[in-house]
Amino acid sequence: MILHQGIRYDSKQQNELLDCLEANLNETLAHGTPPLPRIIIDACESLATKALNGLFNEELAGLGFEVGPMAQRIEEAASIMRKESLEAKVLEELGPEYLNDSYNSAILTDNLCPSSIPQLSPAPCRTLTPPYDHGRTLTKQRVPLGVLFHIAAGNVDGLPAFSVMEGLLAGNINILKLPSADNGLSLRMLEELVKEAPELAPYVYVFDTPSDDLPAILRMAGFADGIVVWGGEGAVETIRKFAPPGVKLIEWGHKLSFAYITEQGITDANLKALAHHIIETRQLLCSSCQTVFLDVDPENDGRESANDITMSKLVDFCERFLPILENAVTESVPLDIGSTAQVTLRLYTQTLEDHAGHTDRKIFRGRGCSITLCEEGSPELSPQFGNVLVKPLPRKRLLPTLRKKKSFLQTVGLLCGEDEREELTNLLFRAGIIRVTGPGSMSHTTALDAHDGEYPLIRYTRIVETRD
């Protein structure tokens, strides 16, 4: 289905709607007023309240959401969409003036040296007197990019809709290409949002265009001032190839996250929290733990066989963690048949390689989960769905090992002693990590979260200037 100015259309009408899309966009840009953040915030607040009151439960069940997890997901999504959360987001990323009644409401006059003039001022409008040029004035204003083309990923339910909401908060017109894995949730969310605030209709366009329909995707990209792409390295590389010259490319790529555990951090409470995180997220999120790294340094042990010492400690950890992981599985919703088959095939292949001596890995199998012990290595994607990797990584090798993957790192669940936390946190940040959390909150999200270390609303706007 397609959502075009608040109206649903059949997918067969895609080309017809694309033929008139450029004229619609130009009309809105020429004569429309960018929707104020308060309009979007109030609409999101109303939508969140309805969802919490169960108005969409029956429809969500029809989309395939199970009752237990559905309630938790609704609560998480609603917390991000509440008025207080979105107001805090706009205040943090764009400044208080953006919550006023007009984009042009704040005019500040300053005499500033060049080094003290913000390159990206949070105020919508600033009138400056340049140094050594007191006869002239310079006005800077932050405005929307114009048209954003969102190419969303399907690994998080509703993510495409949230991407559009952020584009709206920055005042942009938004064209969304739904991912193939989308179950219809994003279109329904945006449809309801437009019903709450009909003035948003000219700012939201949703297409369920297949990824192999390159001509249609190229047309949408040609209308855009910025392309927002969510996805893995392959998807981002493809977008780079067909993006029109000069268009701003905003990449929110797939990332790797892991747990780092010191000897002081190996406690039952920490391991239980980590296990529940792994099982609850099914390791499908960028913030999900794929690998557990242990701070094992055999050289400090004073014995001869360093490798034997390391492997012994890793095996001890795996044998301790596996039953904890199994307990988390028993408290979770069972996997669907397709996911179970996929994991079983991966582990069977790994077992055959183990027996053939083609791998340095050992699998500890549990009920509905597994731990794969690796002798060494860097962050990588696990088999997912409760099947985690365990590797040694002494803290002295932490930075050089992680720097090799610096562009793909996101969250670390840090399990350590309090006297170690500050040192390790700073070391992880220097290695390229974006977020350090406790073991159970790696995937906890709020409206104030940055995307890959950057604020999206700033990236969805630009600075314009006028001079007298």
Q: Where on the chain are the PLM-derived regions?
A:
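N-terminal Rossmann-like NAD(P)+-binding subdomain of aldehyde/semialdehyde dehydrogenases
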Residues: 1-140, 409-413
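Conserved beta-strand scaffold positions in the cores of enzyme catalytic domains, especially
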Residues: 2, 8, 206, 248-250, ...
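Generic non-transmembrane alpha-helical segments
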Residues: 39, 43-50, 192-199, 324
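Rossmann-like NAD(P) dinucleotide-binding subdomain of oxidoreductase/dehydrogenase enzymes
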Residues: 111, 131-279, 300-304
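NAD(P)-dependent aldehyde/semialdehyde dehydrogenase
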Residues: 281-289, 293-411, 422-431, 436-468
